[in-house]
Amino acid sequence: MKELAMFYNFSDERLRKAKFALMPLKIQVKKVEKEDFNQPIGFLAGIKGIEPAAEKFDGDGFDEEMIVMHNFTNKTIDSLIRALNKCGVGRVPLKAVITPTSEDWDSLTLIKALKADHEEMLKKLKMKS
């Protein structure tokens, strides 16, 4: 199965760098437009059986960069992270792999869950230090 990385809110220059860096890994890159933020992420990734939302998104959305991955192994995730660091894109804190649970979520639901997980992780790290 083909790996797909969906990029949210990346500038054209940062997206160009990412595409170039991921080309040797044969990872397909897709830019998700704001008008698609209400679509199920499984639909955006081309997962069979996931129906599209009827309307285009016209709300405020979110501005944070996010990468959503489909058909990735742990090794492929590591390769993606290394490639993005090497090409100058750098660290992208909000990353997710599509799961059977999240494939029906829209992008707003996903980013809310990611932010909550990220905050929880930061709290745990502060407690340890």
PLM segments and residue spans:
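Long, low-complexity, intrinsically disordered polar/charged segments
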Residues: 1-9, 65-67, 114-115, 128
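Mid-chain, well-packed structural core segment of small domains
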Residues: 58-87
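Short beta-alpha junction loops
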Residues: 10-11, 35-37, 73, 99-103
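Short, structured active-site "lid" loops
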Residues: 44-66
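An N-terminus-focused feature that recognizes amino-terminal "leader" regions
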Residues: 20-24, 35, 60, 122-129
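N-terminal, charge-rich interaction modules
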Residues: 1-48
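Helix-rich interaction surfaces within compact, conserved domain-sized segments
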Residues: 3, 16-20, 77, 81-127
